[in-house]
Amino acid sequence: EDQNLWYHSWTRRAARACFRPFIGMRLTPNHITALRWAAATAACGFFFRGDMVSGGLLWVGSAFLDRCDGEFARMTGLSSRVGYLFDLIGDIVFNGIVFAALGLGISISAALGGVLGIPGDIWLIIGGLAGGGVFLAGVLAEINEQGMKNDEKTFNGRWGFDFDDFAYLIGIIPCLGGAPYLLIGASIGGPLAAVVIGAKLARKRMAC
């Protein structure tokens, strides 16, 4: 049976290639998820301190590990409800917290010398909007996917990339000096995504 693009995306193929040698060892998917939590926590800490390069590199690593735990679970047959929830909570929580951390880090820089001419307090609001919007979108997406087939997602990918691969940009863009622009974009895109997914859910319920 064919599976959707997300299973065959480049990043998931890379994840399977990297962790296939560990099959049969004591490594479990939950170990990988725990490492992903640690990397994401460290990334948020560096973003909060204003170290965008260190934070960005750690975030890219955590995003890759987020693909690896699920692929390793499928390869080894070690999938579990606890592991699924462990991974899901990390996805939703960290995808929101990272923008709040970026907002705090940029606000400190703004207080010291200004960033794009926007005061530090406003950056806190922008970070809150981005983090809250992305968090809500993640929760609504998970609700929307309940009852869908295992290979179906709220948003589909294209050209060898799945929608979740946008998470890599959260690390790459700050490394290139674009954290303020990323945050502004997320403060618009996050709430907008939540509205779009919420509308999908509303249509589903009205159709029932």
Range-by-range predicted roles:
Residues 21, 38-45, 169-172:
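Alpha-helical transmembrane segments of multipass membrane proteins
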Residues 24, 74-75, 104-108:
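Transmembrane helix-loop junction
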Residues 29-82:
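Membrane-embedded alpha-helical segments that form the functional core of polytopic membrane enzymes
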Residues 81-89:
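Membrane-interface alpha-helices at helix entry/exit sites of multi-pass transporters
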